[in-house]
UniProtKB/Swiss-Prot annotation:
Cofactor annotation comment: Binds 2 heme b groups non-covalently with two histidine residues as axial ligands. Binds one heme group covalently by a single cysteine link with no axial amino acid ligand. This heme was named heme ci.
GO molecular function, one term: electron transporter, transferring electrons within cytochrome b6/f complex of photosystem II activity
Gene (name only): petB
Cross-referenced HAMAP family: Cytb6_f_cytb6
Cofactor(s) listed: heme b; heme c
Organism in which the protein naturally occurs: Helianthus annuus (Common sunflower)
Transmembrane segments: 32-52, 90-110, 116-136, 186-206
Residues spanning the signal sequence: none
Keywords attached to this entry: Chloroplast, Electron transport, Heme, Iron, Membrane, Metal-binding, Photosynthesis, Plastid, Thylakoid, Transmembrane, Transmembrane helix, Transport
Designated name of the protein: Cytochrome b6
Function: Component of the cytochrome b6-f complex, which mediates electron transfer between photosystem II (PSII) and photosystem I (PSI), cyclic electron flow around PSI, and state transitions.
Membrane topology, record value: Multi-pass membrane protein
Matching Gene3D superfamilies: Cytochrome Bc1 Complex, Chain C (1.20.810.10)
Amino acid sequence: MSKVYDWFEERLEIQAIADDITSKYVPPHVNIFYCLGGITLTCFLVQVATGFAMTFYYRPTVTDAFASVQYIMTEANFGWLIRSVHRWSASMMVLMMILHVFRVYLTGGFKKPRELTWVTGVVLAVLTASFGVTGYSLPWDQIGYWAVKIVTGVPDAIPVIGSPLVELLRGSASVGQSTLTRFYSLHTFVLPLLTAVFMLMHFPMIRKQGISGPL
């Protein structure tokens, strides 16, 4: 095993990377409230894992969506547990994200030189809220349907571009299959991809600049 390790070490300098990760200075003022961002990340990873598992059974059609969710909850092995964990983790992710934003704001973590870290964090907060809006509709029950109808109807109040925006969100003039397809694509592909991209921007900046000092 040592020869295998030495082979990788010679090419990748694994030990230097490990030393950099484990020897990062942590300021003495850091407490449990500075862990809220990490908890949010953990919830996101749980969301990815449980959401991926449910894609094997979920059918994004207006005729089968609700029945497929019922199948997950009542017949699929551990489906009830996977979906329940997905829902609980979603609520926890939103809560931790809100608390994290408040903590950063109240401790001045948005100030120079961490402005870009703050901006990417705000974008991640918006993406997190978007996950909630799009995921809420996927069971396509009465609550999900009317929630989508209300949310997608909000832009209609905007002059000139309101109606085109509504049609863009819904895929047609009314809520239907095109709307569900759009929300499913956003929830399972577009939003996770954007979230991963902004996380890859957010975390290296935190790593580079370190944790902000006490007020």
